[in-house]
Regions:
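A short beta-strand-loop micro-motif that forms or neighbors metal/cofactor-
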Residues: 25-32, 36, 45, 82, ...
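Arg/Lys-rich, positively charged N-terminal/basic patches that mediate binding to nucleic acids
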Residues: 1-32
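Residues that form or immediately flank small-molecule/cofactor binding pockets and catalytic motifs
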Residues: 9, 53, 94
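Enriched for short, Lys/Arg-rich terminal
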Residues: 12-16, 61-101
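A short, surface-exposed loop/turn module that caps and links secondary-structure elements
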Residues: 34-64
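A general structural signal marking secondary-structure boundaries and capping sites
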Residues: 21, 32, 36-40, 101
Length: 101
Protein backbone atom coordinates (compact mmCIF):
# COMPACT_ATOMS: atom_id res chain seq x y z
CA UNK A 1 0.00 0.00 0.00
CA UNK A 2 1.20 3.50 -0.79
CA UNK A 3 0.19 6.81 0.72
CA UNK A 4 1.40 10.20 -0.41
CA UNK A 5 1.15 13.91 0.07
CA UNK A 6 2.13 16.82 -2.15
CA UNK A 7 4.06 19.95 -1.29
CA UNK A 8 2.55 23.26 -2.42
CA UNK A 9 5.40 23.51 -4.95
CA UNK A 10 4.26 20.25 -6.57
CA UNK A 11 0.65 21.41 -6.71
CA UNK A 12 1.73 24.71 -8.26
CA UNK A 13 3.96 22.96 -10.83
CA UNK A 14 1.15 20.56 -11.70
CA UNK A 15 -1.04 23.47 -12.83
CA UNK A 16 1.56 24.33 -15.49
CA UNK A 17 1.50 20.91 -17.16
CA UNK A 18 -0.50 20.42 -20.31
CA UNK A 19 -3.38 17.94 -20.09
CA UNK A 20 -1.25 15.49 -22.10
CA UNK A 21 1.69 15.85 -19.70
CA UNK A 22 -0.59 15.42 -16.69
CA UNK A 23 -2.08 12.26 -18.22
CA UNK A 24 1.40 10.90 -19.03
CA UNK A 25 2.57 11.46 -15.45
CA UNK A 26 -0.52 9.78 -13.98
CA UNK A 27 -0.15 6.84 -16.36
CA UNK A 28 3.52 6.28 -15.45
CA UNK A 29 2.81 6.58 -11.72
CA UNK A 30 -0.08 4.12 -11.87
CA UNK A 31 1.46 1.57 -14.25
CA UNK A 32 5.12 1.63 -13.23
CA UNK A 33 6.09 3.81 -10.26
CA UNK A 34 3.60 2.51 -7.68
CA UNK A 35 4.09 -1.19 -8.51
CA UNK A 36 7.88 -0.76 -8.50
CA UNK A 37 7.86 1.21 -5.24
CA UNK A 38 5.78 -1.50 -3.57
CA UNK A 39 8.07 -4.20 -4.97
CA UNK A 40 11.17 -2.40 -3.69
CA UNK A 41 12.92 -2.11 -7.05
CA UNK A 42 12.54 0.42 -9.86
CA UNK A 43 12.72 -0.48 -13.53
CA UNK A 44 15.50 1.22 -15.47
CA UNK A 45 13.05 3.14 -17.67
CA UNK A 46 11.90 5.28 -14.74
CA UNK A 47 15.47 6.50 -14.22
CA UNK A 48 14.93 6.82 -10.46
CA UNK A 49 18.02 8.29 -8.82
CA UNK A 50 19.10 10.62 -6.06
CA UNK A 51 19.12 14.33 -6.82
CA UNK A 52 22.67 15.66 -6.52
CA UNK A 53 23.26 18.02 -3.59
CA UNK A 54 19.77 17.37 -2.18
CA UNK A 55 19.99 14.68 0.49
CA UNK A 56 17.00 12.36 0.67
CA UNK A 57 15.37 13.67 -2.51
CA UNK A 58 14.92 11.41 -5.52
CA UNK A 59 13.85 12.04 -9.09
CA UNK A 60 12.08 10.01 -11.71
CA UNK A 61 11.57 10.51 -15.42
CA UNK A 62 7.95 10.22 -16.50
CA UNK A 63 8.41 11.34 -20.11
CA UNK A 64 11.34 10.79 -22.43
CA UNK A 65 9.60 11.40 -25.78
CA UNK A 66 9.76 14.43 -28.03
CA UNK A 67 10.28 17.70 -26.21
CA UNK A 68 11.78 18.26 -22.77
CA UNK A 69 11.93 15.24 -20.49
CA UNK A 70 9.30 15.15 -17.76
CA UNK A 71 10.68 14.87 -14.24
CA UNK A 72 9.25 14.66 -10.76
CA UNK A 73 11.03 14.84 -7.41
CA UNK A 74 9.93 13.04 -4.29
CA UNK A 75 11.15 11.76 -0.95
CA UNK A 76 10.25 8.96 1.41
CA UNK A 77 8.18 9.90 4.43
CA UNK A 78 6.91 8.23 7.57
CA UNK A 79 4.40 5.48 6.85
CA UNK A 80 0.85 6.21 7.97
CA UNK A 81 -0.04 2.51 8.29
CA UNK A 82 2.07 -0.52 9.30
CA UNK A 83 3.70 -2.05 6.24
CA UNK A 84 2.75 0.87 3.98
CA UNK A 85 5.13 3.18 2.17
CA UNK A 86 4.70 6.93 2.16
CA UNK A 87 6.16 9.49 -0.21
CA UNK A 88 6.00 13.24 -0.56
CA UNK A 89 5.83 14.64 -4.08
CA UNK A 90 8.00 17.77 -4.18
CA UNK A 91 8.20 19.13 -7.76
CA UNK A 92 7.10 18.20 -11.28
CA UNK A 93 8.08 19.61 -14.66
CA UNK A 94 11.19 19.55 -16.82
CA UNK A 95 14.86 19.19 -15.90
CA UNK A 96 14.71 22.77 -14.57
CA UNK A 97 12.97 21.62 -11.38
CA UNK A 98 16.23 19.99 -10.30
CA UNK A 99 17.69 23.43 -9.52
CA UNK A 100 15.24 23.65 -6.60
CA UNK A 101 14.06 20.06 -6.06
Amino acid sequence: MLTYNCLPSFESDLKHLTPEQHAAFCRVVKRAFVPDLCAGRFRAGLRVKRVQCAEGILELSWSMGAGPAGRATWEYGRACHPGARHITWRRIGTHRILKHP
